[in-house]
From Swiss-Prot:
Native species: Bacillus subtilis (strain 168)
Assembly, per entry: Interacts with PcrA. The interaction is not essential for cell viability or repair of UV-induced lesions.
Disruption phenotype: Non-essential, it can be disrupted. No PcrA-related phenotype.
Entries under PANTHER family matching the protein: DIHYDRO-HEME D1 DEHYDROGENASE (PTHR47197:SF3), PROTEIN NIRF (PTHR47197)
Stated name of the protein: Protein YwhK
Disulfide bonds listed in the record: none
SUPFAM superfamilies (UniProt xref): Nitrous oxide reductase, N-terminal domain
Amino acid sequence: MRKNKLSFKEKAGAEQEECLCFCEGEASREAMFQAPIELPEGFVVDPAEAVANVTWNADSLSCVSDRCLIQTGPEPDEVGVQFAVRLQGTVTLLVSVSPVRNQYGQGDGAVSVIHNAEIDQVVYYSDESDDCPDISDITIENLVVVPPFYGSPLSVTGTIVLVPEPEPVYAFTANPNDQSVSVIDTNTDTVVTTIALPYNPAGIEITPDKSAVFVLHPNNNVISVIDYDTLTVTATILLDQPPRLIRFIPNHEFAYVFTGTAVYVIGIDTLTVDRSIPVEGYDVAIDPNGLFAYVLNFGIVQKVDLTTGEVTGTIERELIVSTIETNWPERYAYVLEQEFFFNYLTVIDLNTFTISSTQELEYEGEYRMFTSGAEVYLYDGFTGNLYSVSPNGAGVIGNVPQSATDYAFTPNGDFLYATRFIEQSIIVYNTDDYSEETVISLGVSPGAITI
């Protein structure tokens, strides 16, 4: 939740100008309704077999956003602004019940009534003033036909889902000392569950379609597969070499696992090894077209055909090439070169397999390169600067003073999650200014993270 902070003076002025109150009203995304059904004389409905059906119209609903205050810290002047998103108006329901029979049990008709459900409620709080929901997403759930009792007529009850709950976006951390994976709901910044594993985990990545999570166990030559929806281990892939890193490409059917001496191509749906390509090195990136691997080995970058295993090109560098990344759909590779206190970022055009540019980075910088989603980033542990990497080079986008084990951005780019191994926690940074948003305590030591 992003916090729009106000000074105490601004808060007082805002209160005087707009009579702001604190955000204390309860928010609910649902509204209950009960529609009485009057049956024509001489007709009956058996509630045990009756079925209800509802169609609706919400054209008269409107959305308003009311400013309100939230406490952002323990001090009285630590106050921010949010917006209470309220829906007001009427949802018109056409409620039907069937079968309707005559007093002799004959017939198979239906009876319908129009019921107006009055709506006036806060559905959620937001950081944005224009964050109204899509009215077309309204659904009706939990329909129940209630038999008449104590003079009350037959009725239909149900729930109007005004705003669906957001789909969970999970962060997964590999906890090597605990043989587990922690699952965090990034909508609420809470730990949903901890998944026990048979071995110590190292690397961890989510498939592009978010159907599964692949967890690497290099000490055991094993990959565990976690179902994204059920959050359970559903499969184990056995290799004859230790998996050291894993890559995925959007819209491709394979996972690419590097062992240091080979690239294993594994079917995401079949969870079987399709083929392995012998190649030696210590880091690898996959071409966005899925046809080539780019392998680092001391001072060289090799281009390897993932079908034949043939080395089709080599680029030599003077410094040690330490890390390589690609980002989809752009066909560029980014190589971090480091030796002693010197640091360079080299951009390779994959269409021609030639160097596009080389950028000198900060002297004595402690750089690491990582991907999150389709983007590539650099982090300098010496200065705390965070860089976005593109074909034009690297540019500073923020400063994160506390170094971490691993980093991952939420898909919308609003927050950066940083794992802290010794502290057994995750720091969540707001990417507006890279201020600390919250700290999530895990109770275990997290290593790699993926969102």
